[in-house]
A protein has these predicted regions:
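Active-site beta->alpha N-cap acidic-glycine motif
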Residues: 41-127, 133, 137, 144-149, ...
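A short acidic, helix-capping loop that chelates divalent metal ions and anchors anionic groups
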Residues: 124-129, 187-189, 218-222
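Divalent metal-coordination and catalytic microenvironments
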Residues: 68, 83, 92, 116, ...
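C-terminal domain-boundary segment and adjacent tail
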Residues: 41, 45-58, 85-86, 100, ...
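Active-site beta-loop-alpha junctions enriched in small/polar residues
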Residues: 70, 95-97, 121, 158-161, ...
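His/Asp/Glu-enriched short active-site or ligand-binding loop at hydrolase and phosphoryl-transfer sites
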Residues: 162, 168-204, 244-255
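Charged helix-capping and loop-helix junction motifs
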Residues: 131-138, 192-199, 225-232
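N-terminal membrane-anchoring alpha-helices
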Residues: 2, 6-55
């Protein structure tokens, strides 16, 4: 047997090679699982702290106000009314299936100066989606957001903050920058109150923060949006007392170069997001 074949198959012949393959199979499957689900660890606070661009850390004098899980006709209009009264704008991460049912709400969001962004098509766990579903659904949601709002969306936030490899690639192919949050209100929890929401947000509130709240109970208990709504005036007031302006992600200074340049750098492995990702998970930037 030629030497290179002996090395490839093993000196014990094909049977020995098969035994080696069987032994390596669990390790290979584990590596594939890590490749798929590894990015999902980004929802954990220690990981997000190592990925400031992904977490949404922005300008020091600004706080980005963001809402997930809408639009819902029973709650989103109330948030829009309150934001109008407060003179604030925000970014709404919408679900495609809800925007499809209530496009008028999407138009109102944009018409009142807020920003639409992509939260996916449905509020499912990205880690258990069959192959290809996330790519199709993220693309479908992005197209709908653009059709309703008249502006190509810039941001993607996965449900539960679980950023699978497929979701990451699908978002980037659509020119969407994945962004999570630096602080949330835990407004979906049973027993949440305006006071608890404000206290939870305030614990991590500082310049450059991205705040996550919910304008819908689509993925939580009925009425769970009320504490967040009632906490808004005090939250905006607290930001003002800290000398911080409140607004959408588009005004937050997240990320680096314009989208076209960023996309080109992503594909050659040199975008800010890619470098941070590599630094966090491999200890290198790939330069």
């Amino acid at each position: 047997m030629p030497g290179h074949l002996t090395s490839a198959i093993g000196r014990d012949g094909p049977a020995g090679g098969c035994a080696m393959s069987r032994a390596a199979l669990p390790l290979g499957l584990a590596c594939l699982a890590l490749l798929h689900a590894g990015p999902a660890a980004t929802w954990l606070p220690p990981v997000r702290r190592r990925l400031p661009t992904l977490a949404g850390v922005g300008d020091r004098g600004h706080v980005a106000l963001t809402f997930d899980d809408g639009p819902h006709p029973g709650s989103t209009p109330r948030f829009l009314d309150e934001l109008g009264r407060l003179g604030c704008h925000a970014t709404f991460f919408v679900l495609g299936e809800l925007l499809e049912r209530h496009p008028w709400l999407g138009r109102r969001i944009v018409g009142e100066g807020h920003e639409l962004a992509v939260h996916g098509w449905r509020h499912g766990n990205p880690l258990i989606a069959p192959p290809g579903r996330l790519t199709a659904e993220i693309g479908r949601a992005a197209d709908l957001v653009e059709a309703v709002g008249g502006v190509r969306p810039a941001w993607y936030r996965p449900p539960y903050g679980a950023l699978s490899l497929e979701a990451l690639l699908a978002a980037r192919l659509r020119g969407l920058r994945p962004v999570l949050w630096t602080v949330w209100g835990r407004d979906w929890e049973a027993g949440a109150t305006p006071g608890s929401v404000l206290a939870t947000v305030s614990a991590g509130l500082r310049g450059g923060a991205t705040v996550l709240l919910h304008d819908s109970h689509h993925a939580s208990l009925p009425g769970s949006w009320r504490p967040a709504l009632d906490a808004l005036p005090a939250l905006v007031d607290r930001c003002g007392r800290m000398g911080l302006s409140v607004g959408p992600l588009r005004d937050h200074g997240v990320g680096g170069p314009p989208r076209a340049a960023a996309e080109a750098r992503f594909h050659d492995g040199h975008s800010p997001f890619t470098q941070e990702f590599k630094r966090a998970f491999t200890g290198t930037t790939g330069k």
